[in-house]
Swiss-Prot record:
Binding positions for ATP per the UniProt entry: G149, G150, A151, G152, V153, G154, K155, T156
Compartments reported by the entry: Cell inner membrane
Protein family (similarity comment): Belongs to the ATPase alpha/beta chains family.
NCBIfam families linked: atpD (TIGR01039)
Domain of life: Bacteria
Record GO cellular component, one term: proton-transporting ATP synthase complex
Identification of the protein by name: ATP synthase subunit beta
Upper lineage: Bacteria, Pseudomonadati, Pseudomonadota, Gammaproteobacteria, Pseudomonadales
Gene3D superfamilies: 2.40.10.170, Bovine Mitochondrial F1-atpase, Atp Synthase Beta Chain, Chain D, domain 3, P-loop containing nucleotide triphosphate hydrolases
InterPro entries cross-referenced by the UniProt entry: AAA+_ATPase (IPR003593), ATP-synt_VA_C (IPR055190), ATP_synth_F1_bsu (IPR005722), ATPase_a/bsu_AS (IPR020003), ATPase_alpha/beta_chains (IPR050053), ATPase_F1/V1/A1_a/bsu_N (IPR004100), ATPase_F1/V1/A1_a/bsu_N_sf (IPR036121), ATPase_F1/V1/A1_a/bsu_nucl-bd (IPR000194)
Primary gene name: atpD
Length: 459
């Protein structure tokens, strides 16, 4: 292995000089010969034997002149069943203090996406047990879903509930990549999995907020590589990424440090390419499927920001969380008019489901239009049909709320899993006027429609 010396350190970016006949390739992993043993990844070759690298760990204590050795290959991480139930960092090292990972097999984190011929599609629906999602933006097995929302509208709680419902109901493997999120949430999530007895089916990879940008930029690839291994063995895998925006943000930090000119809103000029490299690998092949659920932070609640806008293009279903709905106390704060799914098609989900979903959206849209009239003139000025529609819309709006299992400790209400059949029956009944006689508060924070009828008796 060739070795070189550090010649310049600027934050997380380190320039290393090698002999001209043994310059490391792009994406090679380099090891600094110091007590910390920091790993570097080659990003650019500057000429004269100098390479510009990005550090995967802290650069504290490094100095010019330290020896650096070239590993001769890209960063590789352990893959396979030995990773289940473990927490690892970006380099695949265990950070849960439970001993080394018992596998010899390691895969490089930079891999080509499956070719066109290898890819496979499908229309099998994935039931989540969350009414609003199953109704208006159904997920598909092997599809990609984005949870879009600003700060504090419930992306992580929704993600946790989806993990709980799908990982427990679905018997396959899951990989969770924590990209630039709070360590506290990572810790809560670990204990949540442990208490639900599904930890032995989940591999956890964390590169949290306190890590340098190089680490946060690569940790999503580490998680994805582990998921690809399970897929190639013929499994149906769930890949959860929280948060994909921090992946973009880490790319922005790295890009600026590497001296690239920023593009729109200060993002890196390679934004679309970086996102494409990651997203094109998250796909299903003829061997197995990867169903991916990604949380997407929306800066300043602006969905046209380049980062969320670039993510939209890659998704099959988008779940948009709205601050206005959260402020009404309706959780999950999913906006049924903004959220979309490619599966919302009568040929895929069936005519009854399609008509019910579109009926719900029509009623809520009409209510939105009538709100201005109600605010100025009051309810009395509306026609009888509009009054009836407004009453049904308010019931639908409340019935879209649901108590979550993962939020039991905060709300004190026990969580509810609602099957798709019950969800469709409930909303269809409200649209048909079967429950016009029930008060609207009976529909708030309940599971199925039977529970709403029971609640109405007590009011």
């Amino acid at each position: 292995m060739s070795s070189g010396r550090i010649v310049q350190i600027i934050g997380a970016v380190i320039d290393v000089e090698f002999p001209r006949d043994s310059v490391p390739s792009i994406y090679n992993a380099l090891e600094v010969q110091s007590a910390a043993g920091t790993t570097l990844e080659v990003q650019q070759q500057l000429g004269d034997g100098v390479v510009r690298t990005i550090a995967m760990g802290s650069t504290e204590g490094l100095k010019r002149g330290l020896e650096v050795t070239d590993s001769g290959a890209a960063i590789s991480v352990p893959v396979g069943k030995a990773t289940l139930g473990r927490i690892m960092d970006v380099l695949g090292n265990p950070i849960d203090e439970a001993g080394p990972i018992a596998t010899e097999e390691r895969w490089g984190i930079h891999r080509p996406a499956p070719s066109f011929a290898e890819q496979a599609g499908g229309n099998d629906l994935l039931e989540t047990g969350i009414k609003v999602i199953d109704l208006v933006c159904p997920f598909t097995k092997g599809g990609k879903v984005g949870l879009f929302g600003g700060a504090g509208v419930g992306k992580t709680v929704n993600m946790m509930e989806l993990i709980r419902n799908i990982a427990i109901e679905h018997s396959g493997y899951s990989v969770f990549a924590g990209v630039g999120e709070r360590t506290r949430e990572g810790n809560d999530f670990y204990h949540e999995m442990k208490d639900s007895n599904v930890l032995d089916k989940v591999a956890l990879v964390y590169g949290q907020m306190n890590e340098p940008p190089g680490n946060r930029l690569r940790v999503a690839l580490t998680g994805l590589t582990m998921a690809e291994k399970f897929r190639d063995e013929g499994n149906d895998v769930l890949l959860f990424v929280d948060n994909i925006y921090r992946y973009t943000l880490a790319g922005t930090e790295v890009s600026a440090l590497l001296g690239r000119m920023p593009s729109a809103v200060g993002y890196q000029p390679t934004l679309a390419e970086e996102m494409g490299t990651l997203q094109e690998r998250i796909t299903s092949t003829k061997n197995g499927s990867i169903t991916s659920i990604q949380a997407v932070y929306v800066p300043a609640d602006d969905l046209t920001d380049p980062s969320p806008a670039t993510t939209f293009a890659h998704l099959d279903a988008t779940v948009v969380l709205s601050r206005d709905i959260a402020s009404l106390g309706i959780y999950p704060a999913v906006d049924p008019l903004d959220s979309t799914s490619r599966q919302l098609d009568p040929n895929v989900i069936g005519q009854e489901h399609y008509d019910t979903a579109r009926g719900v959206q029509y009623v809520l849209q009409r209510y939105k239009e009538l709100k201005d009239i109600i605010a100025i003139l009051g309810m009395d000025e509306l026609s009888e049909t509009d009054k009836q529609l407004v009453n049904r819309a308010r019931k639908i709006q409340r019935f879209l709320s649901q108590p979550f299992f993962v939020a039991e400790v905060f709300t004190g209400a026990s969580g509810k899993y609602v099957s798709l059949k019950d969800t469709i029956a409930g909303f269809k009944g409200i649209l048909n006027g079967d429950y016009d006689h029930l008060p609207e508060q009976a529909f708030y924070m309940v599971g199925g429609i039977e529970e709403a009828i029971e609640k109405a008796k007590k009011l």
